Amino acid sequence: MRIWWLLLAIEICTGNINSQDTCRQGHPGIPGNPGHNGLPGRDGRDGAKGDKGDAGEPGRPGSPGKDGTSGEKGERGADGKVEAKGIKGDQGSRGSPGKHGPKGLAGPMGEKGLRGETGPQGQKGNKGDVGPTGPEGPRGNIGPLGPTGLPGPMGPIGKPGPKGEAGPTGPQGEPGVRGIRGWKGDRGEKGKIGETLVLPKSAFTVGLTVLSKFPSSDMPIKFDKILYNEFNHYDTAAGKFTCHIAGVYYFTYHITVFSRNVQVSLVKNGVKILHTKDAYMSSEDQASGGIVLQLKLGDEVWLQVTGGERFNGLFADEDDDTTFTGFLLFSSP
């Protein structure tokens, strides 16, 4: 139908061209309605193969695949053959003893042997019978003087003898009764000024610092903060007090407990005398101890942590102190 409309339009145009010499051109007509869509053309031929494109960016990793199904259980293998153990045989019977062989021929006579050792002495024989009494012998010599006999009875009292010499002076007799108190005597002259009595002295107080807190275990605690040690009886390098004046001493210690538990002992010459233990409970705590000791010259006293590093919570800073004190109460001869 569209083809017919197309041919008609061409024909009209051709007629108009031929009549231009004789007719005037008229006004253009009103455009007709759009024609219907034409039939689809045939498929074009395949084009030439294009160049290979650039490689695309790697894709994202795929999600893990699902687990495969379990395989079927294999058949049970045949049981292996076990060789049967043989039966133990019976014990054989004991054989009969053999017959005695014939007696051997006598050997030649040996040489004469050496003389044997003397045999042991025989036992004592029985006592023989008493023989007949012999004739009387001659008179013997006079024997020695016999021992002195016992004293005889006391004789009668004799006449008084002459007067003897005077004997030595006897011991002093007991003091007599105290006499009546006498009159007060005159005042004596003033005596000379005596020597001033010098009392022996020994004392110290030491403490820990930030550098010496949390001391090591099982060794003397070295207190390096000197509060009083005028006589140098406490050795800061060794951490020990040494007795220079024999007598009775008082020792005391005051501990600030922080961060860890505390377990200390006061030691005298290597022997633990006094023990103190305190458990840390999340805030600062205090522990202390004191004792009176009799010391001799050269005795040593110190404090030490016992039980390991878990019990060395002895603390010190600008606001907290841990101290060790000792002083002489009185000397002894």
UniProtKB/Swiss-Prot annotation:
Signal peptide extent: 1-19
UniProt entry keywords in alphabetical sequence: Collagen, Glycoprotein, Hormone, Hydroxylation, Repeat, Secreted, Signal
GO molecular function, one term: identical protein binding
Organism: Homo sapiens (Human)
Tissue: Expressed predominantly in adipose tissue.
Subunit structure: Multimers (predominantly trimers). Interacts with ADIPOQ via the C1q domain to form a heterotrimeric complex. Interacts with CTRP9B. Forms heterotrimers and heterooligomeric complexes with CTRP9B.
Top-rank lineage group of the source organism: Eukaryota
Biased composition (Basic and acidic residues): 42-57, 69-88
Compositional bias of kind Low complexity: 26-40
Ranges for domain Collagen-like: 24-82, 95-154, 155-191
Gene Ontology CC annotations of this record: collagen trimer; extracellular region
Function field: Probable adipokine. Activates AMPK, AKT, and p44/42 MAPK signaling pathways.
Keyword Secreted in record: yes
Predominant cellular place of this UniProt entry's protein: secreted
Residues bearing the modification 5-hydroxylysine: K73, K127
Name of the protein in its database record: Complement C1q and tumor necrosis factor-related protein 9A
Residue stretches making up the C1q domain: 197-333
Modification type 4-hydroxyproline: residues: P31, P34, P40, P58, P61, P64, P151, P160, P175
Glycosylation sites (chain numbering): K73, K127
PANTHER family: COMPLEMENT C1Q AND TUMOR NECROSIS FACTOR-RELATED PROTEIN 9A, EMILIN ELASTIN MICROFIBRIL INTERFACE-LOCATED PROTEIN ELASTIN MICROFIBRIL INTERFACER
Localization: Secreted
InterPro entries associated with the record: C1q_dom (IPR001073), Collagen (IPR008160), Collagen/C1q_domain (IPR050392), Tumour_necrosis_fac-like_dom (IPR008983)
PROSITE patterns documented for this protein: C1Q (PS50871)
Residue span of region Disordered: 24-188
